[in-house]
Amino acid sequence: MKRGIFDLKEPKTILVVEAHPDDAALFAGGTIALLAEDGHTIVNLCSTYGEKGTLDSSKTLEEMIETEKRESQNAADVLGTKEVIYLDVPDGELAAGVVLREHYTEIVRRVQPEIVLSFDPAIPYDPHPDHQAVGRTLYEACYTSHFPLYYPNQQTRGLKPHLVNWYYGWTSSTPNTFIDISTTLEKKIRAVEQYESQMQMMLQESMNRLDQSGFNIPTLNQLEWKAFVRLWVTRTAQQIGRHKKIPYAEAFHKIGYGVLDILPQLQEI
């Protein structure tokens, strides 16, 4: 153990849950790399393949699925992720509710994580319904996973109830945990670069929106996609860390379940 990220003093299992294959690298890649370097076991769940993330109408869903799977495995190798699991729900069709909660509860019971990383359950102003569905439903599943009468059929398949204590939500409007990723920034950039299909799409979409809105940013016009990735990742990490005087950071909202949510008050008794 090196740094004790998230106050972990010994190797643990960390579950990272994405809506789409590039989410974790973009929002938490530096932190995931730190955790892997510290000896923790990282398991990554892709809720969808992100197969609709293209502006090229000549592409098929099957082609995009194969591309996204390859890119996600490559990114996992860069970050040090041990296992990548695919939930196999169609892109854009994740629906918050009982069905998705049962899927997530099953994964939590199978993986038995100490900590879960994903979207903030109270994610604000995110236009993608998949992001909202993942954050809210996974947060609920981490609570129900230790109650045996929730989805008891899972126990007949050897999946025991499991207690999750801490949930760390990225893309939060109220972050309370900031991780210095200065030593893993380059690794995060390399991981994001593995998603060539998505980064090229993101750059093209950005240019289309600027052009349609009448804005002209010469520097952006001249960027090739890898330079765009480096600029986006670096500037975002700098902006997050600025108020905490951290050169490059990622931010999360740390949520404790049950009594852990009032731990500071209890420690004052």
Where are these regions (language model features)?
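C-terminal accessory domains and tails appended to enzymatic cores
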Residues: M1-P11, F147-K160, T171-I269
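Active-site catalytic microenvironments for nucleophilic, acid-base chemistry
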Residues: L34, D38, E140-S145, Q194
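Active-site rim/loop-helix segments in enzyme catalytic domains that contact anionic ligands
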Residues: M1-V111, I262-Q265
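Structural signal for conserved beta-strand scaffold positions within catalytic alpha/beta enzyme cores
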Residues: V16, C46, Y86-D88, S118, ...
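Histidine-centered active-site/metal-ligand motif
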Residues: H20, H128-H131, Y195
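Short aromatic-enriched loop/helix-cap "lid" or pocket-rim segments at secondary-structure transitions
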Residues: T54-S58, P129-H131, I179-I181
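Internal alpha/beta domain cores that form substrate/cofactor-binding pockets in large enzymes
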Residues: V43, Q73-Y167
